[in-house]
From Swiss-Prot:
NADP(+) binds at T104, H339, G340, T341, A342, P343, K344, Y345, N352, Y391, R395. The modification Phosphoserine is found at S113. The modification N6-succinyllysine is found at K100, K242. This is Isocitrate dehydrogenase [NADP]. It catalyses: D-threo-isocitrate + NADP(+) = 2-oxoglutarate + CO2 + NADPH. The lineage of its organism: Bacteria, Pseudomonadati, Pseudomonadota, Gammaproteobacteria, Enterobacterales. Optimum pH is 7-9. Exhibits maximum stability at pH 6. Homodimer. Its cofactor is Mg(2+); Mn(2+). Phosphorylation state of this enzyme is controlled by isocitrate dehydrogenase kinase/phosphatase (AceK). Succinylation probably inhibits enzymatic activity. It comes from Escherichia coli (strain K12). Catalyzes the oxidative decarboxylation of isocitrate to 2-oxoglutarate and carbon dioxide with the concomitant reduction of NADP(+). GO terms for molecular function: guanosine tetraphosphate binding; isocitrate dehydrogenase (NADP+) activity; magnesium ion binding; NAD binding. The keyword Metal-binding applies. Changing K230M: Nearly abolishes enzyme activity and strongly reduces substrate affinity.
Amino acid sequence: MESKVVVPAQGKKITLQNGKLNVPENPIIPYIEGDGIGVDVTPAMLKVVDAAVEKAYKGERKISWMEIYTGEKSTQVYGQDVWLPAETLDLIREYRVAIKGPLTTPVGGGIRSLNVALRQELDLYICLRPVRYYQGTPSPVKHPELTDMVIFRENSEDIYAGIEWKADSADAEKVIKFLREEMGVKKIRFPEHCGIGIKPCSEEGTKRLVRAAIEYAIANDRDSVTLVHKGNIMKFTEGAFKDWGYQLAREEFGGELIDGGPWLKVKNPNTGKEIVIKDVIADAFLQQILLRPAEYDVIACMNLNGDYISDALAAQVGGIGIAPGANIGDECALFEATHGTAPKYAGQDKVNPGSIILSAEMMLRHMGWTEAADLIVKGMEGAINAKTVTYDFERLMDGAKLLKCSEFGDAIIENM
């Protein structure tokens, strides 16, 4: 199939050498506009990023944006049922760093979730979700500023692998028959009309995630890494996640037992400070992030727990509208708006573009362009502090000025 993508005349590819990015002064970065409110938030993000790069580097650096397609727009460009073209996957692999708006879930069979499909096809095994408070953001908790965590959610395993069979299907009956007759399973309460699923959790998948979390804690001078799990109930999956995490910390980072264990301390080779490696049961953790958020820092968890935790934490600091996220693998990274497509607001220039703008800030940091990233944070803090905000914040603030989506982007630029 001929290419449907226009490659910019100016710009060069980001390359990878020995696991490190080589970022040219004028990188080509693919972006997916996204469905629904993607038409509003993505243009605002592009404008903010361009302004930050221009202000930080005075024209010496510039991003050449290249639109690629997934979701509803892809079906218009590639054909009726082409939601995730092979060309899109190839270009993300080739150009190493990309960013996307929100994507709809295709109606009917085939791909269950485009977001999950992108993560799995590209082996983006880390879902990275930093959660911090921006001064002035309306929050339901008394001290949102105490929440400052970075979540490493395992992206490739757990029940998100999508290995499940519908109740009353021949496949479900076959699996249940095998479990009962071959494996001696007696605990399926109602086997006659029962959907069934499988939860994979591997040593390799766990260790590469926990390794990345500890490396992040070292590089960013963080105090602790917490393994969150339900190992008290699921001993051989969630419990194994905890055990393999501790094992990796001992074997690769010289972790030493604290008071007989299981908690460990790891010395940060850059600062000499100790990083505590600890674990907590998932339901207790969801209590603790409300009661004692300051005690937690870098979080490593399996896929489902990570989904719950990152959204719960986002609400604590002011909602999913400004929660950034990234999906990172060894070969490439895809930064994303973490909210849905909100089709009823599409094209109204109304919604908060903060999530994809702060995801772009993460992207710039990933590229090593920290000066431009810092300007976006400064601009976001300034706009929110000045109470110049979109409708989702304006209705919760006293004396705020209501801005459109595009105007909020402009306010971020003005506050840089």
